[in-house]
A protein has these predicted regions:
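Glycine-rich, acidic/polar active-site loops that bind/position phosphate-bearing ligands
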Residues: 1-184, 192-197
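A short glycine/serine-rich beta->alpha loop
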Residues: 189
Length: 199
């Protein structure tokens, strides 16, 4: 197959190694990775959006670019508490146990004051992401207890996708330095809101 550098997505240094975002396809053009279909869909949207705009008489537009800012929701759990739950350590989610004593009536948590330990984690995370050129505009508590959200600055779709993959990896590494575990599973706890990724 062919390996091609995606020059629209920035190269970066991770753990003293230069990482270059690439696309990989077969000699016949079949996609062998997850990036090639994304790049092709961006091209298809550009082509069809231009066609529609030109039909409506807007001939000045030469290119249509998609952008996205995937807000990443996550749970932060103390490492000692996490290690006591084998289902969490093996599956990243709870499989048994009693339902929480309260449901979603803890509305004081959503956008409430961030606990100092979590604020330190978020500040450290921001710095690590900044080193990779990933800018976050908002971090806040989410609805469920111990649930939080990071909202990045919008950027071109393929760059935002690369940034989100890096963000999830860095979130877990930074959490470990703070004695925490970052759970990215969409529904780690039954009976409370799950984590989503939305625009």
């Amino acid at each position: 197959g062919y390996t091609a550098w995606d020059p629209t997505s920035y190269a970066f240094i991770k753990d003293k190694a230069l990482c270059i975002p690439t696309a990989f396809c077969s000699y016949g053009g079949e996609a062998l990775d997850k990036k090639t279909p994304l790049l092709r869909s961006m091209q298809a949207l550009n082509k069809q959006a231009l066609r529609v705009l030109h039909l409506f008489g807007n001939e000045d537009v030469k290119c249509v670019r998609t952008s996205v800012g995937p807000e990443q929701e996550y749970f932060l759990v103390d490492r000692e508490m996490f290690d006591k739950r084998k289902d969490l350590t093996f599956c990243g989610r709870t499989l048994f146990g009693a339902k929480p004593p309260k449901g979603q009536e803890m509305d004081d948590h959503y956008f409430g004051a961030i606990k100092p330990r979590v604020a330190e984690y978020m500040a450290d995370l921001n710095e690590e992401l900044w080193k990779l050129g990933i800018l976050a505009k908002t971090e806040h508590n989410e609805v469920a207890p111990a649930q939080h959200e990071l909202a990045p600055i919008y950027t071109t779709t393929n760059v935002a996708t690369d940034h989100n993959q890096l963000t999830m990896e860095i979130m877990q590494k930074v959490a470990a330095r703070h004695g925490l575990v970052c759970l990215l599973h969409e529904k780690p706890f039954e009976g409370v809101n799950g984590s989503g990724k939305h625009n």
